[in-house]
């Protein structure tokens, strides 16, 4: 992952989540080893009020690896201030069972200088099929 100043924040976020998710789905590498390329060991990601530490994030990768078939990250906007990024993006996915699923994510995140995610606060909501991309 490139350092934050190396690319615009929208591109950094798109690349971060796309390459990470691609590795989760397609690589045979151990989940913990994979995580260490994208997250700090002391990571805390709070999603809709639920805190996820390193162990809970690693555990979350198992069902993602098993069930995710297709995915795309659509970054609507992102703003960087030093090592922090505020962003709004949509995850478009197709799972092993069921139809397409889209989730809007509003995230405030802190990264290390070398691009590892240290902390994130996320609010998410399901996006209805056909809802405009801006959606708010």
What are these regions (language model features)?
Residues 1-8, 62-136:
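A beta-strand edge to alpha-helix "cap/lid" segment located at domain peripheries
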Residues 2-41:
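Short acidic-aromatic low-complexity motifs
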Residues 13, 17-21, 39, 57, ...:
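Hydrophobic alpha-helical core bundles mediating ligand binding, dimerization, or RNAP-core interactions
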Residues 26, 55, 100-103:
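Residue-level recognition of alpha-helix initiation/capping sites
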Residues 29-82:
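A solvent-exposed, acidic/Ser-Thr-rich amphipathic alpha-helical stretch
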């Amino acid at each position: 992952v490139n350092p934050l100043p190396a690319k615009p924040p929208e591109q950094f976020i798109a690349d971060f989540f796309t390459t990470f998710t691609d590795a989760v789905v397609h690589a045979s590498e151990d989940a913990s080893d994979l995580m260490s390329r994208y997250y700090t060991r002391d990571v805390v990601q709070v999603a809709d009020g639920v805190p996820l530490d390193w162990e809970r994030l690693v555990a979350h990768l198992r069902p993602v690896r098993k069930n995710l078939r297709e995915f795309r990250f659509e970054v609507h906007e992102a703003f960087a201030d030093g090592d922090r990024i505020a962003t709004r993006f949509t995850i478009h996915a197709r799972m092993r069972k069921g139809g397409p699923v889209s989730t809007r994510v509003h995230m405030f995140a802190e990264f290390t200088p070398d691009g590892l995610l240290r902390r994130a606060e996320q609010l998410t909501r399901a996006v209805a099929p056909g809802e405009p991309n801006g959606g708010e």
